[in-house]
């Protein structure tokens, strides 16, 4: 739709009314990354282009929606037009690269991915990978019991095969960090940076994949295409049961949903923000109906995202069979609805939600079509807007089940100021209530006056700990031994003469290069018998 004009098209076709023709580019043969399924995205080869109606064709996708369509193109040499972009001609085994301005590629350390996995294990139990840095590859375990990955760092681990001109990949053949049919496994104290694909996947049903743990790890810049991934297409995926995801940090992600880790998940003490940038719909902590029983979601900081914070999902109305999730002591701010509670028999207590709400209620305890949450418990929460509707007021949509107005702070009915105004210093992560505030007096929210729990990793991720980019010239004074590729930052010692008595003394020199030149001393009187015509300094020796 463009103004008053509508341009209809169906699955397998896309109309770009202005962009393609203005570019003068024929996309036939390129790969389109197509977000045409709301929270699902696919890659497809473009099979034809009609410049008359600005449309291109591709093989149909499995779950096409009628709105919110976005795409970008890859896979043709003509698309390279910005420094840093590259294209691999798979047929001719040739790599094309446009370097940054002023950079000579022959003088740089340019590396390319040559293998998918740096480590693979099948039927190996109690294996430990420790203190290993993975660059442009990752690890994979299959049929493993009690395997551990710890204190390891992965740069460019998961990736796609689009650079090989392969579109629409089989989700089971993606080159991603994964565990298949493995239980009791642990990933801890590690970092995952820059992926084109999920950060990590655990495959297998409840009896094949259970009691797996991801803890105290850092995830950044995860999935810049969000395409061709399994299931709901999420950032962290587990298909099994009893997974634990705790004390982690995640930020800057593409997929609409972030953490979806199977039946009866435990998600605690995580800090997550800036998520779901490439797809519609979604939630940070996502639970479908069967996954909600015995789910335990607590002590998390979730903020600054246009997605739902924590969602017990499922269809609307009486068909929703999600039951028995416990969600407590979470702080959520600047999110598009902090809590979405669908189903029944849930326990939602001691949560704090405030800030930008993107026109949704902060805590939604959904009652729809005469069904929902009649037996749920909602107490000791603090939020500006709590109701049984996505946007409607508490007066029009009162919360069902066990809900007592005096045991919650709800800005719809309480007029003691916003939740944020009643917190000590939320900008600096002090979410305790101010003494004498309504939240303080009612003992509601995620923090009491003496609480000091903190979400996220117990270690601080710093670039200096993992200087993957840096100066790689051993002669430079800022040479970084751990750098994997050059960032053009090399600084060199100033060489020169460092003797103040020399005539070419350099006061800025840091390294003496042996170049000192000295004044010739001697008799400079031409009438003297020992006159030295080359003398530059008279030494008083004239006779």
Outline where the language-model segments fall.
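Extracellular polysaccharide-degrading/modifying enzymes targeting complex plant/algal/animal polysaccharides
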Residues: 1-174, 178-180, 428-435, 440-465
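Residues on the solvent-exposed faces and adjacent turns
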Residues: 99, 123, 131, 136, ...
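Extracellular beta-strand/beta-solenoid scaffold signature
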Residues: 113-118, 135-136, 164-179, 194-206, ...
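Surface-exposed loop/turn motifs in large extracellular/passenger domains
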Residues: 120-128, 145-148, 173-188, 202-215, ...
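Core solenoid repeat modules with strong leucine/isoleucine-rich periodicity
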Residues: 246, 252, 259-261, 268, ...
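Predominantly extracellular beta-rich ligand-binding scaffolds that present long acidic/polar faces
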Residues: 302, 318-430
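Primarily marks secretory-pathway-exposed extracellular/lumenal segments that are disulfide-
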Residues: 465-543
